[in-house]
């Protein structure tokens, strides 16, 4: 599996996303196993245990921009029960949150505020872009709307829809958990390679292309 490597360099504060250098590398744990099978396997087990704890205890930051935020909060109600994924603990401060959901239209005036909130989050942290407006500007192709939050934030999961249903948000959360389970991060700030390795996850659109092509009976737009 290929990984995207982002170097952690505390002496270069100006090299932030999207300016920071990134490169595509192979799984670093495989290289460790080839060098020393015992230490490599031990590091693999420790990394898996840490990732298991991270992905099953994701605390979201209570933040929303537009109508997609209403659908996001619906996922916290009893019929959907987001507590199954360990993500029911909504945090009022970005310093206590693990991931941020950009739900709604991102205006240019809000972009610096969103970036400031993201920078206040502690590592490790992740971003979910929810809805067409957050993904690409949606129907607002105008000067005052940012055409995709990935212009200034590193997005981990994109949830399409206008607005997406709560089930779509939950699927995006599960995809984020899957990605976190395959991440490679340093176990401390002084031990190991100081870099963040994020797995290159396959696109759900490409994976389901053949399945969508085979569909012949389209559902009526009057049916929900």
Curated annotation (Swiss-Prot):
This entry carries the following GO cellular component terms, namely: plasma membrane; respiratory chain complex I
Q: What is its EC number?
A: 7.1.1.-
Catalysed reaction per UniProt?
a quinone + NADH + 5 H(+)(in) = a quinol + NAD(+) + 4 H(+)(out)
Main localization is: membrane
Q: Which EC main class describes this enzyme?
A: translocase
Where in or outside the cell is it found?
Cell inner membrane
Cofactor binding note from Swiss-Prot or TrEMBL: Binds 1 [4Fe-4S] cluster.
> Which cofactors, if any, are listed as required?
[4Fe-4S] cluster
Give GO terms for biological process: aerobic respiration; electron transport coupled proton transport
Q: Which residue intervals make up region (Disordered)?
A: 201-224
Q: Which InterPro entries match?
A: NADH_UbQ_OxRdtase-like_20kDa (IPR006137), NADH_UQ_OxRdtase_20Kd_su (IPR006138)
Disulfide topology:
none
Q: Where is the composition biased (Polar residues)?
A: 213-224
**What would you give as a GO molecular function for this chain, any one?**
quinone binding
Q: Which UniProt keywords apply?
A: 4Fe-4S, Cell inner membrane, Cell membrane, Iron, Iron-sulfur, Membrane, Metal-binding, NAD, Quinone, Translocase, Transport, Ubiquinone
Functional note: NDH-1 shuttles electrons from NADH, via FMN and iron-sulfur (Fe-S) centers, to quinones in the respiratory chain. The immediate electron acceptor for the enzyme in this species is believed to be ubiquinone. Couples the redox reaction to proton translocation (for every two electrons transferred, four hydrogen ions are translocated across the cytoplasmic membrane), and thus conserves the redox energy in a proton gradient.
The record describes its quaternary structure and partners as: NDH-1 is composed of 13 different subunits. Subunits NuoB, CD, E, F, and G constitute the peripheral sector of the complex.
Q: Which family does it belong to?
A: Belongs to the complex I 20 kDa subunit family.
Q: What is the protein's given name?
A: NADH-quinone oxidoreductase subunit B
Protein encoded by which gene = nuoB
